[in-house]
Every structure is written in C-alpha cells, then in structure tokens.
Amino acid sequence: MWIGVISLFPEMFRAITDYGVTGRAVKNGLLSVQCWSPRDFTYDRHRTVDDRPYGGGPGMLMMVQPLREAIHAAKAAAGEGAKVIYLSPQGRKLDQQGVCELAMNQKMILVCGRYEGVDERVIKTEIDEEWSIGDYVLSGGELPAMTLIDSVSRFIPGVLGHHASAEEDSFVDGLLDCPHYTRPEVLEGMEVPPVLLSGNHAEIRRWRLKQSLGRTWLRRPELLESLALTDEQMVLLAEFQREHKP
C-alpha cells in the first residue's frame, strides 16, 4: 500500500514509519508513506503557508497555491487511481467498516489541514472524500491521518504477525473484543479462566464469542442494535445476561 501525506509537519509521521507494526510494514516493503510539505511549494522568503479568510473572523486558512501544488506533486508521484482524502471534523466518521473500505485502496493521499482549515474551493476541486475520527477539534489533521494509516495498514497481508489478528480485533464483526490473558496464571489472586487452559479449541472459541457479545452488551449496547445475531450468538448472549444479572 502506498500513502502520500500532505502536511506542514511531515516529521510527525516518523511515529508511523519508524515504530511498531507500521514501522515494520515500512521496513518490509509492505507499506510506503511519502510526505509533502506545502512549505516546499512557496516562493516568498518567509515560506508563507497561511492567509486571512475573506469576511474576517478569527484565525487563518492554509494558502491555496502551496497546498494545491503539494497535492499535485503527490498525485504525480502516485500515478493513476490514488484517492485524495481530507481529514476534517466535517467528514464521515471513521469506524471499522470505513477502515475496511479504505483498506481496499492501494493508493491514498491524505491531506492534513492546519489553522482554521482550507479554502472550500480546494476541497471541491482536489478532494475525493472527507473523513473524521470523531466529533472534537484537534490542532491539525496529522493525528487523524496517523490513526487512519495505522488502522488500514493492519489489513495489508503480511503486516500482522498472525493472519487472524486483524479479523479478531474489536469492531471487525461489529462486536467488542473479548478479554485476553497471558502469564502468570494467577495474578494477585485473579486466575486465568480455566477454559483458556483446557486446550479445547471449540470451547475456547465459544467462550471468547460469549465474552465478546457480553462485553458489547455491557459497554456498547447500541452496537448490538445494528447486528443480525446468529442463533448461536443469541444463545450465548442470553447465557451471559443470565450470569450477569444485577
């Protein structure tokens, strides 16, 4: 997967390219992240990238010319088929379904806003989609872009150590993840559930599904409303609910 990034702070993306799962993906040639700064497309001595908005008001906007030229440079490097995405609180809210959709793209260009945003005409002429990571305001689009990169990269074949890891993440099937345990077997009097030590893979699968359903019911019940549960899932959820009556 190739991802181009338009940002005034490209050095922030070392957190993606140098560390963790995404860093290994870059090192192994499974993920490529290339950055362009609008400052590199300025022609004045101060490398100005912001300007006052028409109509007045607080704050500044990103200048059109440097931003458009940076986007055009990224498009030229990407070739055909690269989707241009603007990270914006006004965009579609990113969820696991959205991550799965975005992961189908082999090329993406992520545009990170700063200041009070960008000229609406840039959005209309250069941007294919707008995405948001939540209903709150950040200082810029870099953190949302890194969130998007991290989440979609988990679906690149070979990125995760185990092929089932991404499939078992929270939200992949609309449910929260089940509890997980590692050594020691007993920690301050709290024991690992015996079923996980049994070696019975069918029972372990059943326990994990039951816990996943139950945790979703306890913590995010609204998620269950949009799911068509199987007969097995309905039985397991009912069992969990009986076991956890107030």
UniProtKB/Swiss-Prot annotation:
SUPFAM superfamilies: alpha/beta knot. InterPro entries: Alpha/beta_knot_MTases, tRNA_m1G_MeTrfase_C_sf, tRNA_m1G_MeTrfase_TrmD, tRNA_m1G_MTases_N, tRNA_MeTrfase_TRMD/TRM10. It is an enzyme of class 2 (transferase). It catalyses: guanosine(37) in tRNA + S-adenosyl-L-methionine = N(1)-methylguanosine(37) in tRNA + S-adenosyl-L-homocysteine + H(+). NCBIfam families: PRK00026.1 (NF000648), trmD (TIGR00088). Homodimer. Specifically methylates guanosine-37 in various tRNAs. Belongs to the RNA methyltransferase TrmD family. This is tRNA (guanine-N(1)-)-methyltransferase. It comes from Yersinia pestis. The gene is trmD.
